[in-house]
Amino acid sequence: MPLTLTDSLEQNIEAMQTLFAHDNTFVVRRTESPAGLRCAVFFLDGMVNALAINQSIIRPLVRADRSRLTADALMQTVIQVNDAKVVPDTDQMLSALLYGDTVILTEGDPRPVAVNTKGFSMRSTSEPDNERVLRGPREGFTEVFMMNLSMLRRRMNDPRLKLSFQRYGGATGTVVCLCYIEGVTPPALIDETRKRLDTLSLDGILDANYISECIRDRTDSPFPTLGETERPDVVISRLLEGRVALLIDGTPVALTAPCILQECFQANDDYYIPARQAGLSRILRVLGFLFSALVPALYVAALCYHQELLPLRMLLAITAARRGLPLPALWEMVLLLLVFELLKEAGARTPGLIGSTMSIVGGLVLGQAAVAARFLSAPAVIIVAAAAVTGLSVPKLQTAALVIRFSLLLAGAAFGLYGVAVGALLFLAHLCSLRSFGQPYLLNLIPRVRAHSEDSWTRRPWSGMRKKRFLAREDEP
């Protein structure tokens, strides 16, 4: 329903009450000063700071010494709040009202004044559960948009940090902030991000994933082509590398672009510990991912087609453990992997410590019982458990590891090691074809620029880094 404001205060009040009919949180407060100044104050109960409204808006209005004031004069001489503005149209007025501002209308002037009186409840800052660190800042984003922006400003006191707002999402009118550093982020990347955001046609945006699925490259790929984080220090670090970040109102998750494969093997505290320790940790993560994705398939392929590759004692031990089992090696491995994934999902959905306890105890009890009952073999249980544990070292690639694991497992069961090799080459070709906001997904896989080699599979000490650039050119020294 379109809203039109006039010079008549009573007509404006009636129009606002009609628009917010059957909404018990909508409050209208009429005021009139001894001099005859008549105003109406509108706000939504539960979204505002009532004390600020009483002291900074209503009290000055009832003490005004003039009988008529324009919106500009009201804002400059009466309202005692620094964040107040004359709103040019009703759409912006309603948006401000719904977001927790207080709107003031006066007799004789249809232009509303919006005053920042937000006072809704919010969660305090805490360390993100999914990005805990052993050393470094422990502050994480919250669901409150402006608080998240203040965390960025506090970490980077530079006017080159640009924060550009835009509303998306139709009914929800969700504010999305495009963050970049002027002079560091390539203009082409900023334009590409804005172009993708302008294609959003969602009726509502309630989480960062709504936007991520719409603007990322290759939504069918199991590899992440858009970075996600809940930590302000990570966002600032990626902005300094020349990337862009998106902060979405109502969610603690920030999106960063471009995203490359190397980023998935980097942890938050790699930059807060000695360089050699960080480099060793990164290499271990790479080995853990490869073990998690490849070893189950290699086990089945070797057991079914290439037993001559196994040491004799190992082959005899596996054969003895599998004697009398009802399932072939392939289905044994598939069943174990599925049970583990179900236990992991159940643990994630169960609240608190019960979930992690249930996953550990459930895996131990079921595995021991299955081996004791001669339903599954102990080597298969060991391999699945090792693959599951090593896969947890790279949480950003858990989905990719799962897809690769099952795909290569089927290929290895059908064609042996040749199937595993061909499947691995197909996944490598897929990685080569991926791009993230115009950048190759395997960028810096083999560093050709010094700025790239300073922080790739390992990193140099901070004394050896010059400028930590993500999109360095080959002509840079």
Go through the PLM ranges and name each one:
Residues 157, 323, 416-417:
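Amphipathic alpha-helical protein-protein interaction surfaces
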Residues 157, 198, 344, 371, ...:
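Short polybasic/polar patches that bind polyanions
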Residues 246, 259-408:
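Transmembrane alpha-helical segments that form the functional core of multipass membrane systems
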Residues 171, 254, 358, 385, ...:
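Positions that flank functional sites
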